[in-house]
């Protein structure tokens, strides 16, 4: 169906542009962007995500460093390792793959990553800049915005260029998607309603929306009754079920024919998240050279 949004195709366009930009940057600086990925433990899903990030990074000319640590590592020891990467001038950007083991203080770890290398956009300084309205999606800003939120916004603007006044219902309040995306949509002059698992009358709220973003983490939770024929549906859910199959928060098979546009899972927002992670990494590289190379 032509109303199904091909996130992989959109992501590939971004990656091709980044590949050309990296080639130009390398000719100017004789260096390449480098992304450090800190992975604690051997969570199968995390390993798959990390491999995809590394594969796409190498495809466009971004070097990577994978730091794989044992689940027995203590919070302070992990912070020490992160500080080493903070002070490594070859590292442009850094992410800590989530989730972390329960024994590790996630907030301390995310705060330990230098805000200037925080290409996931999770450092409290970057979070504060976004929600205070100080920064926007401009690549001239020296702060970072969470990649999934950027990917969602890019998809939404592709299919609804004039967002001013649109009613967007964001279902989910995480720091990774719901909160940052809501902040970005407010900057686009949308009327944003944030819902979550405790929201009453969720169906009637979503039904009135122009755009619905599903990021609630509940497989196939949103059925056709939640949407109107003009709805644009962005499904951010990644839910693993039997046989390692991945499904979204939206009942895709029964919803796709009832709405204007919809993203599939997989193949929707996932590839866009990786594309914007790598875009943030290139931005971090340019920021680190800007004072001496005038990039």
Curated annotation (Swiss-Prot):
- SUPFAM superfamilies assigned: Aminoacid dehydrogenase-like, N-terminal domain (SSF53223), NAD(P)-binding Rossmann-fold domains (SSF51735)
| Assigned EC number | 1.5.1.5, 3.5.4.9
Membrane-spanning residues where? none
| Annotated keywords | Amino-acid biosynthesis, Histidine biosynthesis, Hydrolase, Methionine biosynthesis, Multifunctional enzyme, NADP, One-carbon metabolism, Oxidoreductase, Purine biosynthesis
Q: Does the keyword Hydrolase apply?
A: yes
Q: Which Pfam families match?
A: THF_DHG_CYH, THF_DHG_CYH_C
Q: Which reaction(s) does the protein catalyse, per the Swiss-Prot or TrEMBL entry?
A: (6R)-5,10-methylene-5,6,7,8-tetrahydrofolate + NADP(+) = (6R)-5,10-methenyltetrahydrofolate + NADPH; (6R)-5,10-methenyltetrahydrofolate + H2O = (6R)-10-formyltetrahydrofolate + H(+)
Q: Name one GO biological process term.
A: L-histidine biosynthetic process
This protein's GO CC annotations: cytosol
A single GO molecular function term of this UniProt record: methenyltetrahydrofolate cyclohydrolase activity
Q: Which InterPro entries match?
A: Aminoacid_DH-like_N_sf, NAD(P)-bd_dom_sf, THF_DH/CycHdrlase, THF_DH/CycHdrlase_cat_dom, THF_DH/CycHdrlase_CS, THF_DH/CycHdrlase_NAD-bd_dom
Q: In which pathway does it act?
A: One-carbon metabolism; tetrahydrofolate interconversion
**Role description:** Catalyzes the oxidation of 5,10-methylenetetrahydrofolate to 5,10-methenyltetrahydrofolate and then the hydrolysis of 5,10-methenyltetrahydrofolate to 10-formyltetrahydrofolate.
Q: Which NCBIfam families match?
A: PRK14171.1
Q: Subunit comment for this entry?
A: Homodimer.
Q: Which PANTHER family match?
A: C-1-TETRAHYDROFOLATE SYNTHASE, CYTOPLASMIC (PTHR48099:SF5), C-1-TETRAHYDROFOLATE SYNTHASE, CYTOPLASMIC-RELATED (PTHR48099)
Task: Identify its protein family.
Answer: Belongs to the tetrahydrofolate dehydrogenase/cyclohydrolase family.
The molecule here is called: Bifunctional protein FolD
Gene name of the encoded protein? folD
